[in-house]
């Protein structure tokens, strides 16, 4: 028995709708609330593996990072409310749902089923601090307003950077990556009676603003970003091992 093209397309549409009926409850730490999410599909898992392969073989430092972020934003019901610092805990919950509760790292089997819930109480205050809005004023009269960005800002900036620099080798892009990273955190730059909102700027304009900032601004932002990295490190630390956040998280 064969299925003609029209029937197949109809059946495929029904299959996709059937998949979308099965929601997954994802805990979003910055919201301290549950967000309904679509489950990861085989196609999306393949995209994760392909993204990691592209990152490795073509030295494209953005590829895998972009794919996992894209999946989170597409699958979660409230993408505009998800913060960058939510990315790792959301990814861990997707991994538990798709592959299972355990992952083997350096021949050690880790149970990650409750990792997010176990870690959160220890870092709750740190999370609140990094998602709050802060200001820093330099001795030259420039004030930067900054915070950990929404995930969609991280995605947009990384996507633009990938288009611009995907062919550059890793060692040639380090200085540019530094500006890309700090630009995500800056909301506004103020001086005299003027203000520049980075949230409204295109990629190239963001980079130009970062180039014009005094060194004291960048050092202050780096110290703040290190606090975000510390939170991320605690999410992936378990029993003396580091839970991988590359494609191996979803590969086995």
What are these regions (language model features)?
Residues 1-252:
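Long C-terminal interaction/binding lobes of large macromolecular proteins
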């Amino acid at each position: 028995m064969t299925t003609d093209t029209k029937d197949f397309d109809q059946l495929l549409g029904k299959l996709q709708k059937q998949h979308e009926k099965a929601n997954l409850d994802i805990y979003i730490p910055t919201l301290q609330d549950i967000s309904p999410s679509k489950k990861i599909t085989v196609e999306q898992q393949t995209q994760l593996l392909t993204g990691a392969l592209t990152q490795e073989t073509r030295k494209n430092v953005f590829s895998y990072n972009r794919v996992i972020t894209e999946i989170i934003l597409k699958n979660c019901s409230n993408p505009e409310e998800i913060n960058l610092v939510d990315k790792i805990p959301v990814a861990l919950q997707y991994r538990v749902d798709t592959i299972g509760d355990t992952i083997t790292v350096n021949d050690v089997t880790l149970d990650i089923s409750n990792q997010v819930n176990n870690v959160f109480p220890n870092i709750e205050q740190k999370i609140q601090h990094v998602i709050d809005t802060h200001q820093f004023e330099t001795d030259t009269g420039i004030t930067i307003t900054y915070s950990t960005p929404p995930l969609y800002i991280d995605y947009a900036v990384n996507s633009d950077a990938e288009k611009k620099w995907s062919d550059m080798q890793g060692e040639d892009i380090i200085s540019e990556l530094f500006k890309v990273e700090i630009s995500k955190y800056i909301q506004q730059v103020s001086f005299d009676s003027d203000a520049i909102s980075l949230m409204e700027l295109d990629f190239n304009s963001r980079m130009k603003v970062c180039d014009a900032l005094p060194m004291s601004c960048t050092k202050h932002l780096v110290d703040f970003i290190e606090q975000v990295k510390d939170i991320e490190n605690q999410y992936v630390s378990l029993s003396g091992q580091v839970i991988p956040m590359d494609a191996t998280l979803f590969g086995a």
